[in-house]
Amino acid sequence: NVADTDRIKSYMTDHDVKRAVIVGGGFIGLEMAENLMHAGAQVAVVEMANQVMAPIDYSMASLVHEHLQQQGVQLYLEQAVDAFSCHDGSLTVHFKSGVSLQADMVLLSIGVRAETRLAQAAGIRLGEMRGIWVDDYLQTSAPDVYAVGDAIEFPHPLTGKPWLNFLAGPANRQARIVADNMVMGNKVKYEGSIGTSIAKVFDLTVASTGLPAKRLKMMDIPYLSATIHSGAHAGYYPGSLQMDIKITFSPTDGKLYGAQIVGYDGVDKRIDQYALAIKQGATVADLTRLEHAYAPPFSSAKDPVAITGYVAGNILSGKMSPLYWRELRDADLTGVTLVDVRTPDEYALGTIDGAVNIPLDDLRERMDEIPTGRPVWLFCGIGLRGYLASNILKDNGYAEVRNLIGGLKTYRAATARIAPPVGFAAAGDSASPTEAASAEKAVVRIDACGIQCPGPI
């Protein structure tokens, strides 16, 4: 809140904060990381899970990890804070792993819990999640008492199971519903929230709605997913930056379960379209029928939302057999032919171990190099050329052909090793941040996501 912001700003000024540790890699933690970096502090983010931004899947969070590191944020993932100590005015953060960090300031952004003590004291019923139980009209077990906001639990529209939703948008909508029901009697029902959220993380925008794959898996709900990397607007119009979108859907009828987007421009309007579609019970086929406003500065003739619908439709219909990054990472490739269908120049810049290079344009002439009696796994930069190659092979009698969903971009991001933090002196470490950084080999990384595939290699 604003009062906390003023206190943090004053503390930084009064105490000349140079190193800040943020415990918790959620929305608030990452927004604070950005602002503290802009204020001139070195920032470390400590997260107990293996990723930041819990509402999104790991493959999408990995894109955020990469961006945070490019901005100079030190990431400590799968690290739990055990204790804090203060000696001679210096604060030390101790991890359960034995690692410790020195800091001038520590911020805790470790989540919230429903405050229900007043309701309990009044004898009002609590639900399974220990939030305040309400009915469809947001009325509690006490007939004259209604409840809204973070403290209530309500069935999720997609699962029917109660959950706590800590978002301002639904809370404001609930307040309007309760006002109507208190004045006019219980006439307006609350339909529930699917958790549509968005955050600014330095230059990136990260958004999600509905159910991610990890939550569907945890709840034993069968699902499929599709991932694309598409320009926010027409590629020939200047300034088109890539956005990465992942959707989850039912493997039987294509019902849309969730969507996640990581990008720079146009993320907000796309996530709102997905949210509306999900709440209306739409299928992936419905995504291809959405009518988008199109002009080159704003979108493409085939909007990224529609493209996710087409890709998901190809998977559902059997036109494309999906290969997901975890399957490829964990696979024994002994009995598989792994083919990189990118150009030789792209292949020379790096590929997946065990892959042979047969460019898409040469595939028909070099098909005899691919054995017919074993599975063929294809990949390209983002998935499109792999899909085209899979159609060519299937048309020529290859039975077991799969295409890597999201292409090499998704695979590389999801399997990338988090760079060891550099520049934060651990307790007892005599090396200065500058010395520690200079000891590392100088590597300049350029984010060229605005360059058209494959780019001017």
Located regions from the model:
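Domain-level signature for proteins that mediate thiol-based redox and metal-cofactor handling
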Residues: S432-I457
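FAD-site-proximal beta/loop scaffold in flavoenzymes
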Residues: N1-H15, H94, S100-D180, Q273, ...
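Glycine-rich dinucleotide-binding loop and its adjacent helix/turn
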Residues: N1-A39, Q74, E128, V134-D136, ...
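Rhodanese-like catalytic fold shared by cysteine-dependent sulfurtransferases
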Residues: A285-P296, S300-T337, P344-W377, G381-K441
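Rossmann-like dinucleotide-binding cores of NAD(P)H-dependent redox enzymes
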Residues: V17-A20, F27-F84, F166-A171, V188-K189, ...
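A short, polar/charged loop-to-alpha-helix boundary motif
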Residues: D265-V284
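Mid-to-C-terminal Rossmann-like scaffold of FAD/NAD(P)H-dependent oxidoreductases
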Residues: A151-D265, P296, S300, P304-D330, ...
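Residue-level detector of alpha-helix initiation sites
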Residues: A3, F27, Q51, S59, ...
